[in-house]
Swiss-Prot record:
PANTHER family: NADH DEHYDROGENASE. It comes from Thermomicrobium roseum (strain ATCC 27502 / DSM 5159 / P-2). The lineage of its organism: Bacteria, Pseudomonadati, Thermomicrobiota, Thermomicrobia, Thermomicrobiales. NDH-1 shuttles electrons from NADH, via FMN and iron-sulfur (Fe-S) centers, to quinones in the respiratory chain. The immediate electron acceptor for the enzyme in this species is believed to be ubiquinone. Couples the redox reaction to proton translocation (for every two electrons transferred, four hydrogen ions are translocated across the cytoplasmic membrane), and thus conserves the redox energy in a proton gradient. It catalyses: a quinone + NADH + 5 H(+)(in) = a quinol + NAD(+) + 4 H(+)(out). Keywords: Cell membrane, Membrane, NAD, Quinone, Translocase, Transmembrane, Transmembrane helix, Transport, Ubiquinone. This is NADH-quinone oxidoreductase subunit N.
């Protein structure tokens, strides 16, 4: 009897394969040229991601085709995640320009390794977005996370960098084990690891209004713990402030966005697609996590004096806002609005947060530290840098007509339509609380005397990254409605 093996459709994998090729090319160039120019490596890394972005439009995402069985899904949701991940990765390469051009490490850990790890994490995030089963989803999450563990410790001579990386790694390992345990319980209850098959099985066994089977309840709680760590939701956030503060600033910029994209993509795939019949249970759980997370993140950020640590707690608060968007999920078109609002938030957050960390990196290149005292009177020393930082702070706060305002507005709108008024009010109140620490940055820059002159430095590539993020923050809010309509249609792929 002859056996015919299924042939994978490699055309669906062109974007991630381009990233793989770019990683290999970076390492080959580094090995052949010994010490290649930093600009060459930056150009290769940036061009590879731009090429991968362009290749996204060669795939017919509307078909929702699968390959490798049902493990890899090329649907609209996968496109949305890949788009955000590649944009964030490309911007992070630009923001890293000053850091890589300095040589990173005189003992040999340098540019090629740094950029390869960054691209490896982008690749993992793309796999999470396209995951059709638990195996690919877990593989993508770990690819993304392990690379960031290493990047966090790149400033290995600084104790805070190694400490932050070690804490991130250890807690991440525990969280991954818990996540796998939760997946095992789902498999034991449904007999499948394929997300769509899990949903179909649950629709036949879960009755509305009936108590949930203890095995499924345990699985849901374990998955919530594991995924909660990936997105830095309270109380699974302990690694975040130390990792953000200790990591090199370009890594902090990247870490604040791409792992969060991977985490929320995993939450959407697992809960919205795989466990959709349990939405009555998990929307309530996400609502409570969202409220606790946004309150804790914004309140604790007020006490921070270090800008990177403040942005770490700010990131926790923004995780709460995005969780609130998922808590608004209901079946049908309203569910598309819920997931669409979160995708739009991630898109907006990419520009705002990478831009804010980019300004800090720009200041460090000129001899300043990362505390509030270091930026005192910045408007008198570097007026353009102060203006750029002020734009990002106001956008993160949610000031209209900047991009961050529309991100919060669409989440609040989804909550109101879902009848979750208390969470909508919580977002408004916490946004007002966040004004305290965001505006404090602005007032320190504009209403205090300069402490001294900046050291001269040439960082044109970093400047380009800041220009792009600033332009996006200012302009994309004005065309936010069609972007939201688009991502809402893409979110329907999870149904």
């Amino acid at each position: 009897m002859s056996v015919r093996l299924a042939v994978p459709d490699w055309s669906l994998l062109v974007p991630p394969l381009i990233i793989v090729g770019t990683i290999v090319l970076l390492l080959i160039v580094d090995a052949v040229l010994r010490r290649p120019p930093a600009r060459l490596l930056l150009t290769l890394a940036f061009a590879g991601q731009v090429l991968a972005l362009a290749s996204l439009w060669t795939i017919d995402w509307a078909q929702g085709a699968t390959t490798f069985g049902q493990s890899y899904r090329a649907d609209w949701f996968a496109l949305a995640v890949a788009l955000v991940a590649l944009i964030a990765g490309a911007l992070s390469v630009l923001v890293s320009a000053g850091y890589t051009e300095s040589g990173l490490d005189p003992e040999g850990i340098g540019q090629a390794e740094y950029l390869s790890l960054l691209l490896f994490s982008v690749l993992g995030t793309m796999l999470v977005g396209a995951a059709g089963d638990f195996i690919v989803l877990l593989l993508g999450l770990e690819m993304s996370a392990v690379a960031v563990y290493a990047l966090t410790a790149f400033a290995r001579r600084r104790v805070t960098s190694v400490e932050g990386a070690l804490k991130y790694f250890l807690l991440g390992a525990f969280a991954s084990a818990i996540l796998i345990y939760g997946m095992a319980w789902v498999y034991g209850s449904t007999g499948s690891i394929v997300l769509r098959d899990i949903a179909e099985t649950l629709r036949t066994v879960v009755m509305p209004g009936q108590p949930l089977d203890p095995a499924l309840l345990l699985a849901l709680l374990l998955l919530a713990v594991g995924l909660g760590f990936k997105i830095a939701a309270v109380p699974f956030h302990m690694w975040t402030p130390d990792a953000y503060q200790g990591a090199p600033t370009p890594v902090s910029a990247y870490m604040s966005v791409v792992p969060k994209v991977a985490g929320f993509a995993a939450v959407a795939r697992v809960l919205v697609q795989g466990l959709q019949p349990l939405s009555e249970q998990w929307t309530g759980l996400l609502g409570m996590l969202a409220a606790i997370t946004m309150i804790y993140g914004n309140v604790v950020a007020i006490a921070q004096r270090d800008l990177k640590r403040m942005l770490g707690y700010s990131a926790i608060g923004h995780t709460g806002y995005m969780l609130a968007g998922l808590a608004a999920f209901t079946t049908g078109q309203a569910g598309d609005r819920s997931v669409g609002s979160v995708l739009f938030y991630l898109f907006a957050y990419t520009f705002m947060n990478i831009g804010a960390f980019g300004v800090i990196a720009w200041l460090q290149e000129r001899g300043l530290g990362t505390t509030l005292d270091d930026i005192a009177g910045l408007a008198g020393r570097a007026p353009l840098a102060a203006l750029t930082m002020a734009i990002f702070m106001l956008s993160l706060m949610g000031m209209p007509p900047l991009l961050g305002f529309y991100a919060k507005y669409y989440v609040i709108l989804a909550l109101i339509e879902a009848g979750q008024l208390w969470l909508a009010v919580a977002i408004v109140v916490m946004s007002a609380v966040s004004a305290f620490f965001y505006l404090r940055v602005v007032t320190r820059m504009y209403f205090e005397e300069p402490a001294g002159a900046l050291q001269p430095a040439r960082t044109p590539v970093l400047g380009l990254g800041l220009a792009l993020t600033t332009l996006a923050t200012l302009v994309l809010g004005l065309v936010s409605s069609p972007i939201l309509d688009l991502v809402q249609r893409w979110s329907a792929a999870l149904a």
